[in-house]
Design a protein with these regions (language model features):
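Conserved, structured core segments of small domains
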Residues: 1-92
Length: 92
């Protein structure tokens, strides 16, 4: 199944940050309650890697208020031969 990296940024002020984290945790969603956070290092964002059929399906994991601002990237892997041979890179 395809894997997707999801990044959702939020405002850095204390109230906005706290509210954002509370909304994620209150959903009870396994994905959201296990998100990685950068807030304590000054990077106000949540990161999640999930399996989904499409970017659109991955976006639905997020609370509705944050879906439109999320960055979603399809993940892939490469074989060494693909990179060493400078051939057309195709994910496997």
């Amino acid at each position: 199944m395809p894997r997707f990296f999801i990044e959702v940024q939020h405002e850095s002020d204390q109230l906005a940050c706290t509210r954002f984290v509370q909304i994620f945790l209150a959903t009870g969603s396994h994905y959201l309650t296990h998100a990685d956070w950068g807030c304590l290092d000054g990077e106000h964002a949540a990161w999640i890697i999930i399996e989904a059929d499409s970017k659109e399906q991955a976006r639905l994991v997020l609370p509705p208020a944050y879906r439109s601002q999320a960055k979603i990237v399809a993940l892939n892997k490469f074989k060494v031969e693909q990179v060493d041979g400078h051939s057309n890179l195709q994910a496997y």
